[in-house]
């Protein structure tokens, strides 16, 4: 109730209303309210793909011959980490050399650590914690996965696409996130098994390349 009152006060008193995506604008301001879309800015050159960086980074983590599934997100309920863990568990049953790279911190981290241990897959899951080296970890990954319940405009998903990564994300992300032909959106209602297949199918994208020019034209 307090949130609804606050929304009405903001909409009625603001000179300009700005949202990072159409879907976010409709959620926050309502579909009948006029607002402007201002997409988040990113230094695209910082995420340019480098084969040299990928090789070195994977060697540093002893992941040269591994299939690395990864995400970069805060450990919070909205990011839906349990769904990712359950989906990865099924990936692992089909691909023994699979590894899960989790980059981030947050209030749900201990719960996810316990979940991984309970499933007995801790040898296949790497927790990195907070980092400013996002580019390095995107280069390590073979596929980026984000099963969030909802997102405004996920910057890290844009960054993953710049670096040429295949991306498997939920329909909780807005359509504005679809910037290359290597990203697919799926409903969470498809379940863990189908999501595991979506992740495994991403292996068909065997060639990594920069997508800077493609994304700049968006």
Region locations from a protein language model:
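Aromatic "clamp/platform" in nucleotide-sugar-dependent glycosyltransferases that forms part
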Residues: 130, 149
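A conserved, positively charged/aromatic
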Residues: 1-18, 26-29
């Amino acid at each position: 109730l307090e949130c609804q009152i606050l929304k009405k006060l903001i909409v009625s008193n603001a000179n300009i209303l700005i949202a990072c995506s159409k879907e976010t604008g409709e959620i926050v301001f309502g579909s009948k309210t006029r607002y402007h879309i201002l997409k988040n800015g990113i230094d695209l050159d910082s995420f340019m793909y480098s084969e040299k960086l990928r090789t070195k980074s994977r060697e540093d983590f002893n992941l040269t011959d591994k299939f690395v599934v990864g995400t970069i997100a805060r450990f919070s309920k909205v990011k839906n980490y349990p769904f990712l863990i359950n989906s990865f568990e099924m990936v692992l049953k089909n691909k023994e050399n699979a590894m899960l790279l989790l980059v981030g911190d947050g209030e749900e981290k201990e719960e996810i650590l316990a979940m991984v241990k309970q499933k007995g897959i801790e040898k296949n899951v790497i927790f990195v914690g907070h980092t400013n080296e996002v580019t390095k970890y995107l280069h390590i990954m073979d596929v980026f996965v984000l099963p969030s319940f909802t997102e405004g405009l996920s910057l890290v998903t844009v960054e993953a696409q710049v670096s040429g990564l295949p991306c498997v994300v939920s329909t909780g992300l807005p359509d504005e996130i679809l910037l290359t032909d290597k990203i697919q959106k799926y409903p969470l209602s498809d379940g863990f098994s189908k999501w595991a297949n979506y992740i495994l199918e991403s292996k068909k994208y065997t060639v990594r390349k920069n997508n800077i020019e493609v994304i700049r034209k968006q």
